[in-house]
């Protein structure tokens, strides 16, 4: 690689491939690209089933515990993304040491320092994106907790079924939307792992992106987890004809 500040054609092609794969995976996971149900859309149907079951319970401590678990998991990933982002700042300060290590690898020549720093900035952008997605998801789960509290008790809902249905719909849509942003943040973390291949070279970047894409597709469409969730009710869930499918992010 030359001493230019600009990325090579191979670098740009690998980066474009990476972004295209990210976009395709996101659309496929949300049920907007292929007819086969993904694990994400199947779980969205289960979120709706959860809200309907919750509305039938007089005591909702189990639902509160589930929400706490979702919030804690989201907070963990948000904190981890922030720590990784701080590590990238340290990486920028140790650029010479990292380039020395890369120069010893037989796979590719070490890039110029300026190009290396551009790649680190790209990694920081990925982690910042993931952090903001996790942060917003955490807040949406908070909102969902409030909406769950606003769902009438079963006896009251029986007297006003329309109000009960509207409250269930609000809680479901908020829960699905919170899950969507959490999945987007998780996708950013996963793809940041594939992004690491770019520090070796554009060929390695394309290879790690392809391998990551294959793993994520298998989990979404061909995994045991998907088979455990899929049933007739899920076939009508969000992303496959259900009215509970928020389009805005």
Regions found by a protein language model. Give the residues of each.
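Hydrophobic alpha-helical membrane-embedded segments
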Residues: 11-39, 75-89, 120-142, 189-190
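Juxtamembrane "helix exit" motif at the C-terminal ends of alpha-helical transmembrane segments
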Residues: 1-3, 82-109, 197-206, 212-217
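Cytosolic juxtamembrane amphipathic/interface segments immediately preceding
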Residues: 2-3, 54-70, 168-176
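Membrane-interface amphipathic/juxtamembrane segments adjacent to transmembrane helices
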Residues: 29-67
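Cytosolic/matrix-facing juxtamembrane and C-terminal tails of multi-pass cellular membrane proteins
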Residues: 149-157, 163-172, 219-249
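Hydrophobic alpha-helical transmembrane segments
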Residues: 5-16, 107-122, 202-207
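Alpha-helical transmembrane segments of helical membrane proteins, especially in multi-pass transport
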Residues: 129-198
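Transmembrane alpha-helical segments and their cytosolic interface motifs
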Residues: 63-89, 116, 120, 133, ...
